[in-house]
Amino acid sequence: MSSDIQQIRIGLTNNHPCSYLADRMERVAVAIDPQMQTPETYEVLMANGFRRSGDTIYKPHCDHCQSCQALRIPAPDFVPSKSQKRLLKLLSQEFHWQLKPELDEDWYTLYARYIFARHRHGSMYPPNKMEFAKFARAKWLNTQYLHLYQGEKLVAIAVTDLLPNSASAFYTFYDPDISISLGTLAVLCQLNYCQQTKKQWLYLGYQIDECPAMNYKVRFNPHQRLVNQRWRG
C-alpha cells in the first residue's frame, strides 16, 4: 500500500463464479472504512489496484488467480497507433463529444439497446434505470458523463470519474449497430480530456488477457499494469 495510506480495513466476500473467466472463482476485498470515500483517498487507492462499483471500493482478492491487473495510461505520453489516428481523424470530421454532469434524456434507449445486443448473458441484464444509477454513481465522487455524438445523434456515453490528478474510465455503452470502434473512440476522448486538463493518468480498470473483450485496453500505448504491487510498463 502507498505510504499515503498505511492501513485500510477490508472485508472479504465469499467465493463466487467469476464474471469473466468461466472456469474460475472470484472474491473481492472491500474497503469498509467510510473515510476512504473521498476523491483524494480514492485516487491513492486506485494507484494501489482498487476500483469502485457505486459507493463500494473493492479490489480482486482471489485465492488461486491473479489474472486481473489494473491498467492505466500516462495521458501526456500517449502515442496513438495508426488505427487510433484514423479514429481521431474521424472524430474531428464526423463526431464531437461533451462532458456533462447528467445524462441526456435519451440515454436509456441507447443503454438498453447496448445491453440487449452485447451483454444479454451478463450481470447488467435485463437493463434497469435504477440499477444503473446505483452502479454508476458515487455520492462522494465527481462523476461526469462523456457524451459522444455523430452529428446530432447520441452514439456513446462513457461514465468518467474525475480525480485530482487522474480520470477513470468507469463504464461505457454505445450504439451496437455502428461498426466503428466506439469504445476505443470514447477512450480517445477521455485521453483528450486528460491532456486538456493536465491530468497525469487515465485508469481503464482491470485487464484480463484471457478475456478477448478487454484486449482493446492494451492497444493504448504506453500503458502500465499493476503487477505484484508495482506499476510496470
Curated annotation (Swiss-Prot):
Superkingdom of origin: Bacteria
Family recorded in the similarity comment: Belongs to the R-transferase family. Bpt subfamily.
Catalytic activity, reaction form: N-terminal L-glutamyl-[protein] + L-leucyl-tRNA(Leu) = N-terminal L-leucyl-L-glutamyl-[protein] + tRNA(Leu) + H(+); N-terminal L-aspartyl-[protein] + L-leucyl-tRNA(Leu) = N-terminal L-leucyl-L-aspartyl-[protein] + tRNA(Leu) + H(+)
Function: Functions in the N-end rule pathway of protein degradation where it conjugates Leu from its aminoacyl-tRNA to the N-termini of proteins containing an N-terminal aspartate or glutamate.
Main localization (coarse): cytoplasm
Protein name, as recorded: Aspartate/glutamate leucyltransferase
Species: Vibrio cholerae serotype O1 (strain ATCC 39315 / El Tor Inaba N16961)
Any single Gene Ontology cellular-component annotation: cytoplasm
BP GO annotations: proteasomal protein catabolic process; ubiquitin-dependent protein catabolic process via the N-end rule pathway
Subcellular localization: Cytoplasm
Record EC number: 2.3.2.29
GO molecular function, one term: arginyl-tRNA--protein transferase activity
Record's keyword terms, sorted: Acyltransferase, Cytoplasm, Transferase
Name of the coding gene: bpt
